[in-house]
Amino acid sequence: MLGLGKKVSREAEAAPSASAAFLQVVTPTLLQADADVRALIDRQLPAPNQCQIVAGSAALRIESPFVLSLFVDPSSLDPIADAVLRRRQAGHATTLIVAINPTQLAALGRWLEARANASTLVGTRLILAPTVDGVVRQLADRLAQVTEDNVIRMPVSPEIENTDYKNFFVFNPQLHRLAARIRGFTQNGISRAYLLGGPGSGKTSFAFYFWLMRNKGRFVSVNLAAESTGDKAAIKSLLCGHVSGAFPGAGARTGAFLHARDGVCFIDESHGVTGPVMEVLMEALDNGQYLPFGASAKQPIQCAIVFASNRSWEHLQSAVNLDEFTRMGAAILEVPELHKREEDMIAVVATTLARLGQRCSTWTAPLGLSEAGWKAIRECRWHGNVRALVRVLEAAFVDTASAGGGELIQADEIEHGIALWEPKAHHSHQIYAAA
């Protein structure tokens, strides 16, 4: 199944046995007998003596509601994840918390992609820390059960058949709530929504998820930044279509509204919905009908319309005619900024390093980041969100690998990439959404 949405039935969830620990910790043998590790973890649990530390194995038996994989090599994670998956398939909301150190990032990325491609990445949380102490400090925040999948799988080109697929990873609880909200919209007849989020935050992925949950029709996208929004005839033809002979030499054209019938028409960069664009949309938004260019009969709108903008709501309100703007009548869906989503940031770093490393033939691919390198990423504001982080990682990867810089990308390379692609001060930062 593509995308999120496989929820665990809480009614069907069997109560854990009285002897089951609250948290099972799977760790390398070296840490298994360490009493200090047990004591550190135990202090984060709701009751004492609720931590069981075991060595990972294919025969691992899961009975606890939470399982922590502590610095296990990502290439050995499958038996643990499979055991958790079997537990979930039996009706339990068991959650797997994968804790790695920064040197294991590329290996984690390969594991995440493999699980996502096999549709077996579900109910998982992520922690990145160099030491057990660092893991323990984040553990309490991860002890919340996950009832969603961790990936939206979507075509690289959603409107082209037989295209490759890509994975949009969803680990942050805020994104899980956004997915649940979208699912509620589609289940209850809401056919108009406005996605707000900074550039590169994942708006297109969630618009596509809206279509996945609607489960009918086509997904059709219109990017107003790529269109001649000052030409009313061109915009009317694009959205409403035109009939044969509408202008000299014209053949008939199916507009975006008709092409998306029963599905979703995604209007991106919709801060451009002003002037001629709004004139075309006004009747469609007010009355649910439109007139193809050159036609004599109106057509009903039979698709959901999802708008998206990287502008803040305040900027949108101040830049448009409010009477026109309110005609859009859309419920608001906010995509949180990446700097608030550490687990998603870990997934982006891991999968990007894995992807870049797979292409290397004469270079030695870095395996991960130094502690200082991860700190630089974690402390960056990321106004450009996922897109900017990927550009920074690509620059740092090339600088490190081409110079034979070793197994880890250092902070200097990360800072250089940030200076190139994510400057701390830029005039555009003031107009972007800050969800």
Positions of predicted regions on the chain:
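N-terminal accessory segments that target, anchor, or regulate ATP-driven/P-loop NTPase machines
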Residues: M1-V156, H339-E342, A350, S361-A365, ...
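Conserved catalytic network of the ASCE P-loop NTPase/AAA+ motor domain
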Residues: P16, A59-I62, R87-G91, G184-N188, ...
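The start of beta-strands in P-loop NTPase/AAA+ ATPase cores
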Residues: L23, G263-V264, A331
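Short gly/ser/thr-rich secondary-structure transition/capping motifs
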Residues: P48-Q52, G245-A250, N287-P292
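Conserved AAA+/SF3 P-loop NTPase catalytic/coupling segment centered on the Walker-B
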Residues: L77, T229-K236, R253-N287, C303-V306, ...
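Flexible nucleotide-interacting loop at or near the entrance of a catalytic core
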Residues: R125-G198, A396
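Nucleotide-binding/hydrolysis machinery
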Residues: V156-H176, A180-R183, Q187, F206, ...
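Conserved post-Walker A coupling segment in P-loop NTPases
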Residues: N167, R177-H242, A246-P248, H259-V264, ...
